[in-house]
Curated annotation (Swiss-Prot):
This is Large ribosomal subunit protein bL25. Belongs to the bacterial ribosomal protein bL25 family. CTC subfamily. Keywords: Ribonucleoprotein, Ribosomal protein, RNA-binding, rRNA-binding. GO terms for molecular function: 5S rRNA binding; structural constituent of ribosome. Pfam families: Ribosomal_L25p (PF01386), Ribosomal_TL5_C (PF14693). One of its GO terms (cellular component) is cytosolic large ribosomal subunit. SUPFAM superfamilies: Ribosomal protein L25-like (SSF50715). Residues 1-20 are annotated as: Disordered. One of its GO terms (biological process) is translation. Part of the 50S ribosomal subunit; part of the 5S rRNA/L5/L18/L25 subcomplex. Contacts the 5S rRNA. Binds to the 5S rRNA independently of L5 and L18. This is one of the proteins that binds to the 5S RNA in the ribosome where it forms part of the central protuberance.
Amino acid sequence: MANHQIKAQRRKDEGKGASRRLRHAGMIPAIIYGGEQRPVSIQLNHEQIWLAQQNEWFYSSILDLNVDGGGGEKVLLRDLQRHPYRQLVMHVDFQRVSSDAKLSVAVPLHFINQATSPAGKASGVVITHELNEVHVSCLPKDLPEFIEVDLSTLSVGHVIHLSDITFPIGVELSTRLDKEHDMAVVIAKHVVIEDDTPAEEEGEGDTK
């Protein structure tokens, strides 16, 4: 599991006015909550978070939050608020992580070997990814940044379901898998081209 460090400082002033001043200074108001400790208000460097939030790992990995240069605190991103039209992160929520408590996290799917699969090499075939992430349950030490879905044997007309995915050891779906919840993940099918040319009416062009 990769180590992703985020630097932060404790925040003394709270409220809308204080948050507005922070943003003008290039900082982001944020909070850490969860566990047996009280919530802690912190501030983050906007540039650091703006770059981090463009990466997949920021949303699905355990983050090492370094507050005031002290020891890192293990957290998960739980909420990130963006400005509706400006390139600004407005607020961030982090949840503390306990090493012995299972997490429920959305983990992205990475599809491999699609181009070399029988369906990928066939002409006139569309391969659709119905899901791009799955919610899993696991201990923090077992949390993967992503789960690979191998499409090397995908053939035309084939559907890959959740039950076909191989999950890492210690990782399982958050919801119980049965026939009703065994969702399609990938579908490979031929493209159907409809003929939109209007049929000629009977007798059209006939001369009397």
